[in-house]
Amino acid sequence: MPPVPGVPFRNVDNDSPTSVELEDWVDAQHPTDEEEEEASSASSTLYLVFSPSSFSTSSSLILGGPEEEEVPSGVIPNLTESIPSSPPQGPPQGPSQSPLSSCCSSFSWSSFSEESSSQKGEDTGTCQGLPDSESSFTYTLDEKVAELVEFLLLKYEAEEPVTEAEMLMIVIKYKDYFPVILKRAREFMELLFGLALIEVGPDHFCVFANTVGLTDEGSDDEGMPENSLLIIILSVIFIKGNCASEEVIWEVLNAVGVYAGREHFVYGEPRELLTKVWVQGHYLEYREVPHSSPPYYEFLWGPRAHSESIKKKVLEFLAKLNNTVPSSFPSWYKDALKDVEERVQATIDTADDATVMASESLSVMSSNVSFSE
């Protein structure tokens, strides 16, 4: 998976987040030789594998859906590498690779028209087939998207608003392409972290809003950013036929920069989330595969995930990744609609029962009044 250099796993032990100074941050993008050498082996890397640039037509080999359902290419990250026997405890060491560049994007930077229908269904192959100039330009713009995402995450951690002027400073030499770069950065923020960038006031200030709510209304954790990670996990389980091995789950999480036993400044400690918090919350089921030696574990959807019609949310997530609509997954879409219909019908039945009970109560009261008279 192509890493995006410089996006850190921030230290969340500090209770008072420090202010993000743009000048300091920009200076940090041009490290000394010593700093570059340290950064090459550092473990502070975020993988934006859900970028179209990182999609692979071979993805279905690992996360293929049910046999009757063809998974559109580019829906999920390429996981054709060998699966580890246990979840890695930290990111891989070694020099950083170029950002978002393992495969060419189904979105062509050179055309700057995401609405172009000619791009849909087109197999773009690999970046090796591009002219050097176009490949270099794609690399540079992908890099600017990665830098902007990094800066936005730092602003989010510091609980600070961000201005358009600050964002323009990040892409200063490519400000003519700022609308496209910002649009891609927004997509990453929402898909990977469940954070939407909302403009408020006349001064072009932007604040962050959590967009993924999975819990019951009124619950304290409704709309928390870690819910976006849960959507990713549920999506993998869904695509794998409602059951995914622990190894596959961690392979995906490692690809987005989330590692077992390592605190993530947005998601927190992931192993605890997966095996305790979400299991106790009945969003996930974590069980040992019978007769496995050594013990082998797998994840399934928990009862609460089913009851809250999350299939629909998962389909919406997958559709966004593939720049399509949920109905592009016919059998899954049908299942999701069935869940929604059953939930609506249950609500109607409950309301009908309440109406009947109220009518019976009124009849009894009327009878009592008549008898008293």
Curated annotation (Swiss-Prot):
* Highest taxon in the source lineage: Eukaryota
* Sequence segments annotated as region (Disordered): 1-102
Q: Which GO terms describe its biological process?
A: negative regulation of transcription by RNA polymerase II; positive regulation of ubiquitin-protein transferase activity; protein catabolic process
A molecular function (GO) term: ubiquitin protein ligase binding
Q: Where in the cell is it found?
A: Cytoplasm; Nucleus
* Quaternary organization: Interacts with TRIM28 and UBE2H.
Name the chain's protein: Melanoma-associated antigen C2
Composition-biased stretches, type Pro residues, lie in 85-94
Query: Keywords assigned by UniProt?
Result: Cytoplasm, Nucleus, Tumor antigen, Ubl conjugation pathway
